[in-house]
From Swiss-Prot:
GO terms for biological process: translation. Belongs to the bacterial ribosomal protein bL9 family. This is Large ribosomal subunit protein bL9. GO terms for molecular function: rRNA binding; structural constituent of ribosome. The keyword Ribonucleoprotein applies. Binds to the 23S rRNA. Keywords: Ribonucleoprotein, Ribosomal protein, RNA-binding, rRNA-binding. One of its GO terms (cellular component) is ribosome. It comes from the Bacteria. The keyword ATP-binding does not apply.
Amino acid sequence: MAKKLQVVLNKDVNKLGKSGDVVDVAPGYARNYLIPNKIAFRTTPGVLKQVERRQEQERQRQIELKQGALAQKTALETVGRFKIAKQVGENDAIFGTVTDRELVEVIKESTGQEIDRRGVTLPEISKIGFYKAEIKLHPEVIAEVEIQVVGH
């Protein structure tokens, strides 16, 4: 069996790993491609300690982000219901639709919290009434808020 060489990746490499990962690769692949193209560099005990420290800092940062998202989720869910006023036609049908931008603006006005609109998932809203929307605050944290669409 061929000996493997341990390298640290500088860039994300398909099917190999992400930047900062320590991976075992064939010596020829490392010497002829990864290292000359500055995609990776060889590991030493000092480099391994640095990588471990960096990974621990990243883990701590992810934990803090998740805790912040959980706090934001509880704040959003304690508000209860967000009201959005739309122009209404016949049979309580609204003109246009409720957009993620409108919901984000209403949330910001009522709670003062900034939310990324790309994480908002709205159902098809065509009439006045009550609807549930999902807001992805973190890959592992999803808040569910209630929207009340009213006519004005």
